[in-house]
């Protein structure tokens, strides 16, 4: 693992990395996040009874849309032609709350970690927004990269 920050120039100024000479490869990233909440809030969401509507469906779409706009939200991210983005949301009754998993894929010259992380983050934020009327104490946590494949830096998997 290299310790050099690739987005910094010789004088420490921020710059966008030139990926022009890199090989195109298929790259995949998986990110996750959690929204902890009161058990009653989870029941309301799962029953589809939230006042703002379909929390899970809306959060899924918000995450997908966010992944497609990552380069507009995160400075120095390259715009990517994503070939796949999915957001899965599962109840975790032990939490209690919801687990969000986002997968992003591209065939290109740079990775999709930021797109997966953005999708998971925005899906979690959307869950909070849509259910905050009944539970302002919800907690968003555990946003992290779980796995990535492809590219020069090789593969990564949490715990491996």
From Swiss-Prot:
Substrate binds at residues 76-78, 114-115. The active site is at residue 129. GO terms for molecular function: cyclic pyranopterin monophosphate synthase activity. It holds the Pfam family MoaC. Pathway: Cofactor biosynthesis; molybdopterin biosynthesis. One of its GO terms (biological process) is Mo-molybdopterin cofactor biosynthetic process. Disulfide bonds: none annotated. Keywords: Lyase, Molybdenum cofactor biosynthesis. Its EC number is 4.6.1.17. Gene3D superfamilies: Molybdopterin cofactor biosynthesis C (MoaC) domain. The keyword Chaperone does not apply. It catalyses: (8S)-3',8-cyclo-7,8-dihydroguanosine 5'-triphosphate = cyclic pyranopterin phosphate + diphosphate. Catalyzes the conversion of (8S)-3',8-cyclo-7,8-dihydroguanosine 5'-triphosphate to cyclic pyranopterin monophosphate (cPMP). Homohexamer; trimer of dimers. Belongs to the MoaC family. PANTHER family: CYCLIC PYRANOPTERIN MONOPHOSPHATE SYNTHASE, MOLYBDOPTERIN COFACTOR SYNTHESIS PROTEIN A. This is Cyclic pyranopterin monophosphate synthase. It comes from Mesorhizobium japonicum (strain LMG 29417 / CECT 9101 / MAFF 303099).
């Amino acid at each position: 693992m290299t310790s050099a920050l690739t987005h910094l120039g010789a004088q420490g100024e921020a710059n966008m990395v030139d990926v022009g000479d890199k090989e195109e490869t298929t790259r995949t990233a998986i990110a996750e996040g959690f929204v902890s909440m009161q058990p009653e809030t989870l029941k309301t969401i799962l029953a589809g009874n939230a006042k703002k509507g379909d929390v899970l469906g809306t959060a899924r779409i918000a995450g997908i849309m966010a992944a497609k706009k990552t380069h507009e939200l995160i400075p120095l991210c390259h715009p990517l032609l994503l070939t796949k983005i999915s957001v899965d949301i599962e109840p975790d009754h032990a939490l209690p709350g919801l687990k969000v998993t986002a997968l992003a894929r591209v065939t290109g010259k740079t990775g999709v970690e930021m797109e997966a992380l953005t999708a998971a983050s925005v899906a979690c934020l959307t869950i909070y927004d849509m259910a905050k009327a009944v539970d302002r104490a919800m907690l968003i946590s555990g946003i992290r990269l779980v796995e990535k494949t492809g590219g020069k830096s090789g593969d990564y998997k949490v715990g491996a």
